[in-house]
């Protein structure tokens, strides 16, 4: 007997019972994006490796440890995308979307990182991201955060997420801070673990989000990034905070928040939760005004964010279980009798024409009424339509509300209107 082939570790199947809630959550997210004027862009999952090295930074954990990189038959180095911003910028440059234009784009799809699989974090994971190009003021940063806050309200999780903000300043301000931080860390190398010692010279800002408690205690005495901000960045951040205050969005300024990718400048933010065990990030982003030029385009201000959908689904299920998936079907058509199958299928097609979007399933495979009603329950149907030989003969159909048990005979010509009333 041949050995079963199983899914790769950290790359999951999502079965019909799970995908229904994914679809409802994704639908909510997409509706909000549309209400803010964002358009979808669809991007390849494989890109040239230099794209990510240039965008993310060669000494980041993502590039050094986590990317799935391989050579194709032509000897070109390709990588499964570990994040979406770099590909979105590449597409914007390649297709001329960014030159002297404002763009508001969103994307959704699988990303890939070779890291240890754990709850809510997998090697293939799904991400929704939004990017804005051509706007440089704090007002668009604030609107992006307002958009995400609207998501949390729509999903019923607003009380379970909190916003952390920081400004990491301009490239020049960050370079000055980097020198001060390295000088401080050099004086306390005995407290640093090996990972922090390596990062101290390659990417010292990443030491700030070390999970090592000894390092975290040491950083209480480290220079503060906020003390090194340039005047423009201070003004930008103050403007952002003022707009969020006016919108009633609570936040905490976290001066250790730096994000893990090299392309960020000025605004960075994270929405975090404590409702999944240890604190976890639900959504994160910031401003990256230099990335378009870095990847070969003209200098273009940009800001965006990304969100891991696996963690979001877990959070919604944990704190708002009433946000249940829509039923697989609204209506199940039960047919019994040798002469009813053709009439049932004809009625089903007519109802699909008259009720666009209705989820209607016709029974196939025979079975008595008891078995067919059991199938209707299995598929989560709200209403059963019962068509027997007598109903076919007199042009009626029995409409049964499977929640209340009430049923009534309705003329087939008017059943669509009756169903609309029942389904609301």
Swiss-Prot record:
Keywords annotated in UniProt: Aminoacyl-tRNA synthetase, ATP-binding, Cytoplasm, Ligase, Nucleotide-binding, Protein biosynthesis
An example Gene Ontology CC term for this record: cytoplasm
Entry-linked InterPro entries: aa-tRNA-synth_II, aa-tRNA-synth_II/BPL/LPL, Anticodon-bd, Anticodon-bd_dom_sf, His-tRNA-ligase, HisRS-like_core, HisRS/HisZ, HisRS_anticodon
Name of the protein described by the UniProt record: Histidine--tRNA ligase
Keyword Aminoacyl-tRNA synthetase: yes
Subunit description: Homodimer.
Signal peptide boundaries: none
Domain of life of the organism encoding this protein: Bacteria
UniProt-listed GO biological process terms: histidyl-tRNA aminoacylation
Pfam families in the cross-refs: HGTP_anticodon, tRNA-synt_His
UniProt similarity note: Belongs to the class-II aminoacyl-tRNA synthetase family.
Protein location: Cytoplasm
UniProt-listed Enzyme Commission number(s): 6.1.1.21
């Amino acid at each position: 007997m041949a050995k079963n082939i199983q899914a790769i570790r950290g790359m999951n199947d999502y079965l019909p019972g799970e995908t229904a809630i994914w679809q409802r959550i994704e639908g909510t997210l997409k509706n909000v994006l549309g209400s803010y004027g964002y358009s979808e862009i669809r991007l390849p999952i494989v890109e040239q490796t230099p794209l990510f090295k240039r965008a993310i930074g060669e000494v980041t954990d993502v590039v050094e440890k986590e990317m799935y990189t391989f050579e194709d038959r032509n000897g070109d180095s390709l990588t499964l995308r570990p994040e979406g911003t770099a590909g979105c910028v590449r597409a914007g440059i390649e297709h001329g979307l960014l030159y002297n234009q404002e763009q508001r784009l969103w994307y959704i799809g699988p990303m890939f990182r070779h890291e240890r699989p754990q709850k809510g974090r997998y090697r293939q994971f799904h991400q929704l991201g939004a990017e804005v190009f051509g706007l440089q003021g704090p007002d668009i940063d604030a609107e992006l955060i307002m958009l995400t806050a609207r998501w949390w309200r729509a999903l019923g999780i607003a009380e379970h997420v909190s916003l952390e903000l920081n400004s990491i300043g301009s490239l020049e301000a960050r370079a000055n801070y980097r020198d001060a931080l390295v000088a401080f860390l050099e004086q306390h190398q005995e407290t640093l673990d090996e990972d922090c010692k390596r990062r101290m010279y390659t990417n010292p800002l990443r030491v700030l989000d070390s999970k090592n408690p000894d390092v975290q205690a040491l950083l209480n005495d480290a220079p503060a990034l906020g003390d090194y901000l340039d005047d423009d960045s201070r003004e930008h951040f103050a403007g952002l905070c003022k707009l969020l205050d006016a919108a009633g969005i609570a936040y905490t300024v976290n001066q250790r928040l730096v994000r893990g990718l090299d392309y960020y400048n000025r605004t960075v933010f994270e929405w975090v939760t404590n409702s999944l065990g240890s604190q976890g990030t639900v959504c994160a982003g910031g401003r990256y005004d230099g990335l378009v030029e870095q990847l070969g385009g003209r200098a273009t201000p940009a800001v965006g964010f990304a969100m891991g959908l696996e963690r979001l689904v877990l959070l919604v299920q944990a704190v708002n279980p009433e946000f249940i998936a829509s039923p697989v079907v609204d209506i199940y058509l039960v047919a019994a009798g040798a002469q009813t199958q053709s009439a049932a299928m004809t009625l089903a097609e007519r109802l699909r024409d008259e009720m666009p979007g209705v989820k209607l399933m016709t029974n196939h495979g025979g079975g008595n009424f008891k078995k067919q009603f059991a199938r209707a329950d299995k598929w989560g149907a709200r209403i059963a339509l019962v068509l027997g030989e007598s109903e076919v003969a007199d042009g009626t159909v029995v409409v049964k509300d499977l929640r209340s048990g009430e049923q009534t005979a309705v003329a087939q010509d008017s059943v669509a209107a009756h169903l609309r009333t029942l389904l609301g």
